[in-house]
Amino acid sequence: MAIEEFLLRRFEEPDAVREFPLGRFELVEIGGMTIGRATYQPGWKWSEHVGSSPEERCMVEHLGIVISGRAAVVGPDYDEVMEPGDVFAVPPDHDSWVVGDEPYVSLHFLGADEYASPE
């Protein structure tokens, strides 16, 4: 993909916003990509606030970077805590939740278009 023109966007003016309890996911389309900004409040957990049951897991892959806060991510063969500055690649079949009392913010470069999408 070649970039042929200068483009500038801000998450304060997103193309779409997906809201759910204790969180929101803002989407910006730019240069043929969809980039997402996730903001989750303390107490947020994917299986409780985005998934339809506590046993459900997120089946979207993610590639991104943590901006602030901390979040745990657990899959079939990993259990990690992500912190500011971490660059992450998370395969499908995982759960995640905010760790601590600070909001968690991350940018998503892969999987943003599918994440928390209305069915």
How does the language model describe each region?
Residues 37-57:
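Conserved short histidine dyad/triad with adjacent acidic residue
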Residues 30-33, 66, 91, 99-101:
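A short, compositionally biased micro-patch
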Residues 75-94:
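Short acidic-glycine-tyrosine-enriched beta hairpin
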Residues 38, 90, 94-95, 100-119:
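A short hydrophobic beta-strand segment most commonly corresponding to one strand
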Residues 1-39, 47:
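A short, N-terminal "cap"/entry segment at the start of jelly-roll beta-barrel domains
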